[in-house]
UniProtKB/Swiss-Prot annotation:
GO terms for molecular function: mRNA binding; structural constituent of ribosome. This is Large ribosomal subunit protein uL13. It comes from Shewanella frigidimarina (strain NCIMB 400). The lineage of its organism: Bacteria, Pseudomonadati, Pseudomonadota, Gammaproteobacteria, Alteromonadales. Part of the 50S ribosomal subunit. Transmembrane segments: none annotated.
Amino acid sequence: MKTFTATPETVTRDWFVVDAEGKTLGRIATEIATRLRGKHKPEYTPHVDTGDYIIVINAEKVTVTGNKAAGKIYYSHSGFIGGIKQISFEKLQAHKPEMIIEKAVKGMLPKGPLGRAMFRKLKVYAGTEHNHAAQQPQVLDI
């Protein structure tokens, strides 16, 4: 019996919606990254994108434990000399709450073309509204 290998044509992708309200950032991000990669499926193949589409709502209500709300710093660099920028978790949550979950999940995905394709299947929204009702997403309880 030959080992089954998934191909892009044979992969079936489902849509799931995740409510991040009151959830811990790292715990929700690991589950999302696992499902984006497709590791929860029996037909998982490392070199093929077998993951599902994930819609995250209420990203503005995600939590972190301890003093990380004030102490966690996100860094970015413009590419110019002295162009490093930093922003705390609290300020980023008030300004762009989607970016918190996106950065956490992106760091858990593979680096390269396959990881970028997996990341494109993540849709994050600050509030409860999303525009993917036509895909009939199933509720995923994490």
